[in-house]
Amino acid sequence: MTIYNFSAGPAVLPKPVLERAQAEFLDYNGSGMSVLEMSHRSKDFDDIIKGAEATLRELMAIPDNYKVIFLQGGASLEFTMIPLNFAQGKKAYYLVGGSWGKKAYTEAVKLSKTIAFEPILLGSTEDITYAELPTFDKNDIDPTAAYVHLTTNNTIEGTAVYDIPDTNGVPVIADMSSNILAARYNVEDFAMIYAGAQKNIGPAGVTVVIVREDFLNDQPMLSSMLDYRIQAENDSLYNTPPAYSIYISKLVFEWVKEIGGVDEMEKINREKSGLLYDYIDQSNFYTNPVRKKEERSVANIPFVSPSEELDAKFVKEATAAGFKNIKGHRSVGGMRASLYNAFPRQGVVELIEFMKKFAVENA
């Protein structure tokens, strides 16, 4: 039985990447050592981290005036680091279109109790369970504000921001954790992009930060570890980095390049997700909660059956049939198919066949 992993993260990795990592596991590049036990100051690891950065720059067309940093702590740590580095004494706006955006805003509010800045909720659709993206009037934004924070893909709710809104000249910071390298964005539209690795980049343990140099803080932070400038000046080596996660990420970047780059990857993802959306749309058994088709995520597709009881039955039977981790997030229920870059098209085709069979048997 073929296993298809629909996990929202940590998520499926490309099989060629896993096979290469397996082949190099005990002896990387003739060194006689695994990357797991290699010094982060060695030439071999220097080649790995520089190669990872160079390939990512090529894939995303990252300009020279942006720094690429590999950090620890997950994207959730950035919820604290961002206001700590950039917002002191200023306003900071948050556009909340999903659960992770709300967490970023909540952390900012917490921090504002001890650090002087003003977090402002620019827009939220929590009252309609994030079934669509929030809107706002750009004239409501103070042009002297530190930044506008948004999430480009809402992993739990299945919506995505493809066109970056006008923010009245205020720098945009984006959490791109779940659709980085899956859809094309112009890096220059952002002052900073960050992404946890465990969806489209690699294994958990590393977070990629892409930040414009002139946006970096010029005041010392409370902690060197939480200071973007120090991390950037030390080329991600201020302390021991998550070396193996960076190595796997490098292999994933090379795999995306071999596929044809981000533009080709987006084309594949739209075709792949389109198969499932088209079936759900014509079905009278399943529904997708996203109200506007143009806001649908290509990475995360939530859906429900006619009842919670049938949802539970679907998850149980799907799991037994090899469709793993398809249960929806605990906060929303139902089912969720996470179709990240490495997820195979055949898995979508077979899922649809299972969905058809289940619908007939339970109509």
From Swiss-Prot:
GO function terms (MF aspect): O-phospho-L-serine:2-oxoglutarate aminotransferase activity; pyridoxal phosphate binding
Cofactor note: Binds 1 pyridoxal phosphate per subunit.
Predominant localisation class: cytoplasm
Sequence positions that bind L-glutamate: 41
Binding site for pyridoxal 5'-phosphate: 75-76, 100, 155, 175, 198, 239-240
Cofactor(s) this protein cannot do without: pyridoxal 5'-phosphate
Metabolic or biological pathway: Amino-acid biosynthesis; L-serine biosynthesis; L-serine from 3-phospho-D-glycerate: step 2/3
Keyword field contains Cytoplasm: yes
Alphabetized Gene3D superfamilies for the sequence: Aspartate Aminotransferase, domain 1 (3.90.1150.10), Type I PLP-dependent aspartate aminotransferase-like (Major domain) (3.40.640.10)
Class of the enzyme per the UniProt entry, highest EC level: transferase
A matching Pfam family: Aminotran_5
Positions where N6-(pyridoxal phosphate)lysine occurs in the chain: 199
GO biological process: L-serine biosynthetic process
Known role: Catalyzes the reversible conversion of 3-phosphohydroxypyruvate to phosphoserine and of 3-hydroxy-2-oxo-4-phosphonooxybutanoate to phosphohydroxythreonine.
Subunit structure: Homodimer.
Assigned protein family: Belongs to the class-V pyridoxal-phosphate-dependent aminotransferase family. SerC subfamily.
Protein name: Phosphoserine aminotransferase
Originating species: Streptococcus suis (strain 05ZYH33)
